[in-house]
């Protein structure tokens, strides 16, 4: 954890002490703790934020991500479905569901969720990248290459060097499999 993360967490903890009924300060604490890898504290902060503001989709999504990182998949899935009841067009929730299914090795389900995320946000590098991985896992090389090319194009357009490098590595691996 960086000093910056530590300072942010300490500032958020102090804000919680000063404003114990403010859902937003708990949300910020959850976010800071999640980024700092304090996942249990992040979950507690998000839970409190949601208790104070039950329709706070950002806090719910943060909790769903945290539960996924804690491998509490059923809890994460349940929260994702609650968010989608409030907002069926929340693309990041479909992406998170896709990640859950990837981590469980359920590639068909992962692809389905990533496709929903892609329908809502067609220029998302990470969704295309994950779809390429998913299609590769289910042995659909042509779709895998289609999505990795789209991911590479998006990364190129956005001057995302890390994305370009990741795309090239996966693209070369996919080509090697097709030989």
Identify the residue ranges that each predicted region occupies:
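TPR/TPR-like (Sel1-like) alpha-helical repeat modules
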Residues: 125, 129, 133-160, 169-172
């Amino acid at each position: 954890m960086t000093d910056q993360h530590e300072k942010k967490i300490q500032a958020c903890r102090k804000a919680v002490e000063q404003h114990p009924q403010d859902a937003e300060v708990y949300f910020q604490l959850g976010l800071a703790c999640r980024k700092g890898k304090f996942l249990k504290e992040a979950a507690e902060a998000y839970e409190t934020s949601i208790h104070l503001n039950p329709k706070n989709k950002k806090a719910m999504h943060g909790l769903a991500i945290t539960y996924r990182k804690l491998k509490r998949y059923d809890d994460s899935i349940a929260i994702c479905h609650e968010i989608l009841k409030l907002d069926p067009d929340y693309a990041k929730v479909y992406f998170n569901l896709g990640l859950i299914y990837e981590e469980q090795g359920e590639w068909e389900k992962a692809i389905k969720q990533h496709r929903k995320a892609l329908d809502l946000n067609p220029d998302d590098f990470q969704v295309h990248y994950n779809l390429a991985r998913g299609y590769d896992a289910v042995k659909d090389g042509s779709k895998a290459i289609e999505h990795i090319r789209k991911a590479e194009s998006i990364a190129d357009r956005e001057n995302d060097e890390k994305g370009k490098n990741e795309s090239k590595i996966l693209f070369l691996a996919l080509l090697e499999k097709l030989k």
